[in-house]
């Protein structure tokens, strides 16, 4: 008898308040790192009804025009009219940025040229064979839906849509493999005059049917489109948004553990971000090499210390070689010191705004160097697999 279960993941659009905050924080990071590669950035953003607060710590010689950066992000997301609940022109932008503590900095910038970890912590990476990008199917589908909401709003196909929105996809698995979609939930902000029946039909026809792979669609899918009724008040007018509040959306949709550290607004000396990217890089290359069908990779660091304090590979029983050997392989093939990660993934680039919506992983963009599978042959050689 086949073992059957349901698994659910969610995504949010770029106009969700938490994602607005993430994008502003990463836009600040991009502005600074483009001009000062030695900068240390920890930028946190709050958006609420009619205002935005940018706070955190910097160590840089660059002046960053915070108001201009924040307003440009909000404009590009689509909050261009007060009727949407937030307007890039009239929103107040408050700057509470301070200087990085020298106590932290002394452990990061070392005299020997190495970089100490910016904090202690544990990070996870994951890969599996459920999608071509080696991501879990539920989160991959959820991101495609929220991307679809934004695309159809911006290109005018569904002009009644507004920037705020969410998706959630429940997938049925049999014997550990995805076989069909069970439930789709979409909540999207819309114009006041929009009829709910029209909105539901349009979202299913223009987004679900055109975005999701036909192999997973069936006549028995349960659809919940704006299940509470109208969704006119949205964005920061409806809910406050904060940087780092969507860490499961940002990663694997709950398919693997999470160390708890957020990404956005942090320069790559912060291992919360860079080591999580490296762990994905490791996991994806392990699965792509064929040595396993799934890989969870954990790395952990101590503040100011160069080498990781632990590295773990868990293939959940799918490995063709022992997990302990794969752990040794990772140590031999990959550079997992903060400096090694930054150099091997070329992380001192203004690439981070793009990561701040629709997932940091599983998107084949040129900027996303951690999605490369250029270590496959080295892994095969180490493991003796042809």
Swiss-Prot record:
Binds 2 divalent ions per subunit. Binds 1 potassium ion per subunit. Its EC number is 2.5.1.6. This is S-adenosylmethionine synthase. Pathway: Amino-acid biosynthesis; S-adenosyl-L-methionine biosynthesis; S-adenosyl-L-methionine from L-methionine: step 1/1. L-methionine binds at residues 57, 100, 239, 270. Residues 100-110 are annotated as: Flexible loop. InterPro entries: ADOMET_SYNTHASE_CS, S-AdoMet_synt_C, S-AdoMet_synt_central, S-AdoMet_synt_N, S-AdoMet_synthetase, S-AdoMet_synthetase_sfam. K(+) binds at residue 44. The gene is metK. It catalyses: L-methionine + ATP + H2O = S-adenosyl-L-methionine + phosphate + diphosphate. CDD domains: S-AdoMet_synt (cd18079). The keyword ATP-binding applies. Its cofactor is Mg(2+); K(+). GO terms for biological process: one-carbon metabolic process; S-adenosylmethionine biosynthetic process. Catalyzes the formation of S-adenosylmethionine (AdoMet) from methionine and ATP. The overall synthetic reaction is composed of two sequential steps, AdoMet formation and the subsequent tripolyphosphate hydrolysis which occurs prior to release of AdoMet from the enzyme. The lineage of its organism: Bacteria, Pseudomonadati, Campylobacterota, Epsilonproteobacteria, Campylobacterales. Belongs to the AdoMet synthase family. Homotetramer; dimer of dimers. NCBIfam families: metK. Mg(2+) binds at residue 18. One of its GO terms (molecular function) is magnesium ion binding. ATP binds at residues 16, 164-166, 230-231, 239, 245-246, 262, 266. SUPFAM superfamilies: S-adenosylmethionine synthetase.
């Amino acid at each position: 008898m086949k073992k059957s279960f349901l698994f659910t993941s969610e995504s949010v659009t770029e106009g969700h308040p938490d994602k607005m905050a993430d994008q502003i924080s990463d836009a600040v990071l991009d502005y600074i790192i483009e001009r000062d590669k030695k900068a240390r950035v920890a930028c946190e953003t709050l958006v609420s009804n009619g205002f935005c607060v940018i706070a955190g710590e910097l160590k840089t010689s660059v002046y960053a025009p915070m108001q201009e950066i924040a307003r440009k992000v909000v404009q590009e997301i689509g909050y261009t009219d007060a009727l949407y609940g937030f307007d890039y022109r009239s929103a107040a932008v408050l700057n509470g940025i301070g200087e990085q503590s020298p106590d932290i900095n002394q452990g990061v910038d070392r005299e020997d040229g190495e970089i100490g970890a910016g904090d202690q912590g544990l990070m996870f990476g994951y890969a599996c064979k459920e999608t071509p990008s080696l991501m879990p199917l539920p989160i991959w589908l959820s991101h495609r839906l929220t991307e679809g909401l934004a695309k159809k709003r911006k290109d005018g196909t569904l002009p009644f849509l507004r920037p705020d929105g969410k998706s959630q996809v429940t997938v049925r698995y049999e014997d550990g493999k995805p076989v069909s979609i069970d439930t789709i939930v979409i909540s999207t902000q819309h114009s006041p005059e929009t009829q709910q029946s029209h909105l539901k039909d349009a979202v299913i026809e223009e987004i679900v049917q055109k975005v999701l792979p036909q192999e997973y669609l069936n006549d028995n899918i349960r659809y919940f489109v704006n299940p509470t009724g109208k969704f006119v008040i949205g964005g920061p007018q409806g809910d406050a948004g904060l940087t780092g509040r969507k860490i499961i959306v940002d990663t694997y949709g709950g398919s693997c553990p999470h160390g708890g550290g957020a990404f956005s607004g942090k320069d790559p000396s912060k291992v919360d971000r860079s080591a999580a990217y490296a762990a994905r890089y490791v996991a994806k290359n392990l699965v792509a090499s064929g040595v396993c069908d799934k890989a969870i990779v954990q790395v952990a660091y101590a503040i100011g210390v160069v080498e990781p304090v632990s590295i773990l590979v868990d293939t959940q029983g799918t490995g063709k070689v022992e997990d302990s050997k794969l752990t040794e392989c990772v140590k031999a093939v990959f550079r997992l010191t903060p400096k090694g990660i930054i150099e091997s993934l070329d992380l001192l680039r203004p690439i981070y705004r793009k990561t701040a919506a629709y997932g940091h992983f599983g998107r084949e963009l040129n900027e996303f160097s951690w999605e490369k599978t250029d270590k496959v042959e080295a892994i095969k050689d180490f493991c003796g697999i042809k």
